[in-house]
A protein has these predicted regions:
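Positively charged n-region of N-terminal signal peptides that target proteins for export
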Residues: 1-4
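Bacterial N-terminal signal peptides
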Residues: 7-15
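N-terminal (or domain-start) structured segment
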Residues: 20-111, 150-152, 174-199, 203, ...
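An extracytoplasmic/periplasmic, membrane-proximal ligand-sensing/linker region
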Residues: 26-28, 260-322
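Hinge/capping helix and adjacent helix->loop/strand transition within the periplasmic-binding protein
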Residues: 79-85, 100-187, 236-238, 249-282
Length: 322
């Protein structure tokens, strides 16, 4: 009798989950963006929120919860009720690299979230001050090795994608320059313009207007393919440094335990939205490379997070060792 009761209860719960998913969403959904408004992560999150709103018939509202390299907002999302009414638009920094920088993080990127879907990847650019004595990656490496003690590297905060990108570059070259933290990409660019720091690695969109204006030099795109926004800038692979590979993923997650039918409903809406030409243009204007359809789903995103954690952990631990 006891076993029959348990089986019946499990069937009832499964039925409730299915009914919940069938009706979902019935009210406003919060999309946490764990960074301040205005940057690539925020714009990407708003594009995603708009997709969900249009395809699922309820308002998906962005809430910016910045601080500590995106980990404060990510922690809030991890602790939210797993009912589909709080999701997060995160990226490689918050959902792969963060444990290396924050030992008391409070969440596990692999264990505390349900992957929903991969949005895009944003290749990073090595940008240097206008008068930096190098015009390509080979010259940069030679100068950096000979003048390691003089180099100042700017980044947008510990755990940010620019911080990760710079550490990957430094590791590939074998240098440990002075690292100067800022509160975002814009202050880093201002410091490069003013000559206070020598270089930065950041998604293309941040340095782009300064490169186009000729006030900052672009030396390398950190992927296999050139950026359509800067087609004349060669890649790290072309210039013989494939270890400098950094194209942070941007993706959507839900708290662990969110019913799978809800996850699948969100994933389906995201996939449909990413197929729209207008959405593809908006993301391309950010310098993003939209994920191919076979890489977008929950299973593929989960595998990507796992592989990025495995790839980044030894590199970043070594790069940040005293």
């Amino acid at each position: 009798m006891g076993r029959q009761w348990i089986a019946a209860a499990l069937l009832a719960l499964a039925g409730m989950g299915g009914a919940q998913a069938q009706d979902y969403p019935v009210r406003t959904v919060t999309v946490i963006v764990p960074f301040a408004a205005g940057g690539p992560a925020d714009v990407t999150g708003r594009i995603v929120a708009d997709i969900f709103s249009r395809y699922l018939g309820q308002q998906f509202v962005v809430e910016n919860v910045g601080g500590a390299g995106g980990t404060l907002g990510s922690l809030r999302a991890a602790r939210a009720a797993p009912d589909g009414y709080t999701i997060i638009s995160g990226h490689m920094g918050t959902h792969a690299a963060a444990p290396m920088f924050y030992p008391n993080l409070g969440y596990d990127p692999e264990k505390d979230f349900e992957p929903i879907g991969l949005i895009a990847e944003q290749p990073e650019l090595l940008a240097v001050r206008k008068d930096f004595p190098a015009n390509n990656l080979k010259e940069f490496i030679a100068y950096a090795k000979a003048n390691e003690g003089k180099l100042n590297m700017g980044h947008a905060g510990v755990g940010s994608v620019s911080y990760v990108g710079c550490l990957l570059l430094n590791s590939a070259i074998g240098i440990k320059p002075t690292m100067v933290p800022f509160t975002g990409t814009a202050p880093v660019m201002n410091a490069i313009l003013g000559g206070q720091v020598d270089y930065d690695c950041d998604p293309v969109l941040g340095p782009l207007p300064h490169v186009q204006a000729g006030t900052v030099k672009a030396l390398a795109i950190a992927t296999k393919k050139r950026s359509p926004l800067l087609p004349d800038v060669p890649t790290s692979y072309e210039q013989g440094l494939p270890e400098f590979d950094c194209a942070p993923f941007y993706a959507v997650f839900a708290p662990k335990g969110t019913p799978m039918p809800i996850i699948e409903k969100l994933a389906d809406a995201l996939n449909k939205g990413l197929n729209e030409a207008v959405v593809q243009k908006r993301l391309a204007d950010l310098g993003a490379e939209i994920a191919e359809p076979d890489r977008r789903g929950p299973k593929a995103l989960g595998a990507l997070v796992k592989s990025e954690v495995a790839r980044l952990t030894p590199i970043l631990k070594a790069a940040t060792a005293k």
